[in-house]
Amino acid sequence: FPPWKDVNIQSEKANTPEAFALAQLPNISAWQKTTDMFGPIPYKKAGEPIMVVPYDSQEEVYNFFFEDLSAAIEVLTPKAEQNLKLLPNYDAVYRGDVVKWVKYANSLMLRMAMRIRFVDSAKAQMYAEKAINHTIGLMENKDDEAKMERGAGLVFVNNIETLANQYGESRMGSSMFSYLVGYEDPRIESYFTESESQYAVEVFNGRKYQAVPTGHVYAQNDTYKEFSMAKVEKTTPTYWMRASEVYFLRAEGALIGWNMKGSAEELYKRGVEMSFEENG
């Protein structure tokens, strides 16, 4: 939190609120994943110079998310409408492209809205439609994807590659194998490597794969050495969000009657098409 707090302080001193608004986006994105995994977290008072930081309920945390995200979008929108660049030499995600940052922010708002729709449908619909009706809009194209990779002085290594190749701890699971093979999904070649194991299964495309059966746990990682693993390299980007997810979120919203600027069927099909485009 100290670096994030420092950005806020320096942004206020320099009268550049857009710098802190930009910093809010990866901050909210990371904390959203954290609260979805662990529930209540210290958020509003996190980073304060106090001995005991109070936890906020997940409902409170999401309310803070929506407030902070809305404020950030409000600050960044005029910059996006002027097609200005912001901190391009320090931006490893969008190289300073504020239009894409605002599209990401709106898409993040849609994702968060969909996460709360079973507990507060009215609020979820309000924020989802707010995101889609924004003047800059949402992610719609492959180039809109938010991804971390080398750049802006960042030494980046894909963490899945580290888990799979360096630690030997990440391999294809049987559920994923079942879906991809059962639907004869050609993206399996983009997602996973072939297996040279004598137990590998030849599938519809003539290639062989081996997956870890659900519930099987072995003490030694070497047991899984020849199983199919994620097809990533050290330089493969880590994706925060892609346009295909946004289309699927819109399809879900349309399915329950929200105004998502398209029918559920149209948006779902576009999501599938976009996923194929994203994965070659």
Task: Map each language-model feature to its residues.
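Structured, solvent-exposed acidic/aromatic patches
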Residues: F1-N279
